Curated annotation (Swiss-Prot):
<keyword id="KW-0963">Cytoplasm</keyword>
<feature type="binding site">
    <location>
        <position position="67"/>
    </location>
    <ligand>
        <name>Mg(2+)</name>
    </ligand>
</feature>
<dbReference type="InterPro" id="IPR000086">
    <property type="entry name" value="NUDIX_hydrolase_dom"/>
</dbReference>
<comment type="subunit">
    <text>Homodimer.</text>
</comment>
<dbReference type="GO" id="GO:0008299">
    <property type="term" value="P:isoprenoid biosynthetic process"/>
</dbReference>
<comment type="similarity">
    <text>Belongs to the IPP isomerase type 1 family.</text>
</comment>
<comment type="function">
    <text>Catalyzes the 1,3-allylic rearrangement of the homoallylic substrate isopentenyl (IPP) to its highly electrophilic allylic isomer, dimethylallyl diphosphate (DMAPP).</text>
</comment>
<feature type="active site">
    <location>
        <position position="67"/>
    </location>
</feature>
<feature type="binding site">
    <location>
        <position position="32"/>
    </location>
    <ligand>
        <name>Mn(2+)</name>
    </ligand>
</feature>
<protein>
    <recommendedName>
        <fullName>Isopentenyl-diphosphate Delta-isomerase</fullName>
        <ecNumber>5.3.3.2</ecNumber>
    </recommendedName>
</protein>
<feature type="binding site">
    <location>
        <position position="87"/>
    </location>
    <ligand>
        <name>Mg(2+)</name>
    </ligand>
</feature>
<feature type="binding site">
    <location>
        <position position="116"/>
    </location>
    <ligand>
        <name>Mn(2+)</name>
    </ligand>
</feature>
<dbReference type="GO" id="GO:0005737">
    <property type="term" value="C:cytoplasm"/>
</dbReference>
<feature type="binding site">
    <location>
        <position position="25"/>
    </location>
    <ligand>
        <name>Mn(2+)</name>
    </ligand>
</feature>
<keyword id="KW-0414">Isoprene biosynthesis</keyword>
<dbReference type="Pfam" id="PF00293">
    <property type="entry name" value="NUDIX"/>
</dbReference>
<feature type="binding site">
    <location>
        <position position="69"/>
    </location>
    <ligand>
        <name>Mn(2+)</name>
    </ligand>
</feature>
Length: 181
């Protein structure tokens, strides 16, 4: 895969430039565009992934299925499809926004900051996973309600963006409705 960049955003969340992804994520990460996707199988189970230990931010932490950054000139939907293929080796369908205006800023235990405008989507897996171990060290298909209970009981074991996304009542209802269809 070619070197990835993040699309930097100004105070009005408008693109203002790009920066190499690894260089962007520091103790003072600039605001940039991202996405988050919750992937479900045909049985309505959610794919929860554990981030590789080689990840710069939140290594080894459990999170939602796939996250990433649209590249300049790429739609969010195109970026989600690209990252699902790269990280999980999976094809997807029925890509649906569930929390289109999510944004957050969080600092990991090593001081690395995430500072993202991060629309959240749900999608359905249509092929068998072929996980990229450089991105994902473990994964689990689980019932959404069980994951929600785990997020409530042990939020520290999950990425802060996953906890924040699921804690939004409207987003949680949309995810629950999505997994039940």
């Amino acid at each position: 895969m070619t070197e990835e960049h993040v699309v930097l955003l100004d105070e009005q969340d408008k693109p203002s430039g790009t920066l190499e992804k690894y260089a962007a994520h520091t103790l003072n990460t600039p605001l940039h565009l991202a996405f988050s996707c919750w992937l479900f199988n045909e049985d309505g189970q959610l794919l929860v992934t554990r981030r590789s230990l080689s990840k710069k931010a939140w290594p080894g932490v459990w999170t939602n299925s796939v996250c990433g950054h649209p590249q300049q000139g790429e739609t969010t939907e195109e970026a989600i499809i690209r990252r699902c293929r790269f990280e999980l080796g999976v094809e997807i369908t029925d890509l649906t926004p569930v929390y289109p205006h999510f944004s957050y800023r969080a600092t990991d235990p090593n001081g690395i900051v995430e500072n993202e405008v991060c629309p959240v989507f749900a999608a359905r897996a249509t092929s068998v996973l072929q996980v990229n171990s450089e991105e994902v060290m473990d994964y689990q298909w689980s019932e959404f309600k069980s994951v929600w209970q785990s997020l409530l009981a042990t939020p520290w074991a999950f990425s802060p963006w996953m906890v924040m996304q699921a804690s939004d009542e409207q987003a949680r209802k949309r995810l629950l409705n999505y997994c039940q269809r």
